[in-house]
């Protein structure tokens, strides 16, 4: 699958389903679950590496984990999900030349076929435009942007009219720049619906209601593996409790043998 194929999904009213992955096991599970795309998100900084935010993640980290995810795939290459890698904090906010260099390393060194970039500020717009002109597909990401939490916090975005207009304008700009898709995070359902109806490229929601063209979730959140759950992700299973229960039972049984 290529990034441009996601536009066909929208034209055909076919829902896009995505999960995050961070190693070969989570990559294999996502593939076997028949998702359309796998996002190697910077959330792995917290899920896998134990950091309190996404900010410490490095370029080397994202390359390492993207390769690990791809090694978990078992299907024929044409049946494998599309792999998209997040660009870590300060790998694209450092000027166009450096951003091209770093994004190029991700594409050259992994099986990722696109990168995801947060925000739509004028400086970021220039970077996105340059990357696309250089042949690197870009997925946009607006609404709640976790890499900006030191300034914006982690609260829901788009609740005021001013904020809604800003997000709608950003979505339009990202489409015009050439993004093949946009993640909408933690915004009101009706705002996401309005954006979805306006754009010709697909919107993929996380905490943005059911009107988006697709949905993405952090797999560890969905499986209930994290202590701190985001308000917009209801676990489908309390995985941590289940695993701990079974492991404790095994430990006790082994002690008795």
UniProtKB/Swiss-Prot annotation:
GO cellular-component term (any): cytoplasm
Pathway: Cofactor biosynthesis; (R)-pantothenate biosynthesis; (R)-pantoate from 3-methyl-2-oxobutanoate: step 1/2
Gene3D superfamilies noted in UniProt: Phosphoenolpyruvate-binding domains
Catalytic activity: 3-methyl-2-oxobutanoate + (6R)-5,10-methylene-5,6,7,8-tetrahydrofolate + H2O = 2-dehydropantoate + (6S)-5,6,7,8-tetrahydrofolate
Annotated residues for binding of 3-methyl-2-oxobutanoate: 42-43, 86, 116
One MF term in the entry's GO annotations: 3-methyl-2-oxobutanoate hydroxymethyltransferase activity
Active site, per annotation: 185 (proton acceptor)
Subcellular localization(s) per the UniProt record: Cytoplasm
SUPFAM superfamilies: Phosphoenolpyruvate/pyruvate domain (SSF51621)
Its EC number(s): 2.1.2.11
Binding note for cofactor: Binds 1 Mg(2+) ion per subunit.
GO BP: any one term: pantothenate biosynthetic process
EC supergroup of this enzyme: transferase
Keywords linked to the UniProt accession: Cytoplasm, Magnesium, Metal-binding, Pantothenate biosynthesis, Transferase
CC cofactor: Mg(2+)
Annotated positions binding Mg(2+): 42, 86, 118
Signal peptide: none
Subunit structure: Homodecamer; pentamer of dimers.
Protein family according to the UniProt entry: Belongs to the PanB family.
Function, as annotated: Catalyzes the reversible reaction in which hydroxymethyl group from 5,10-methylenetetrahydrofolate is transferred onto alpha-ketoisovalerate to form ketopantoate.
Name of the molecule in the record: 3-methyl-2-oxobutanoate hydroxymethyltransferase
Gene: panB
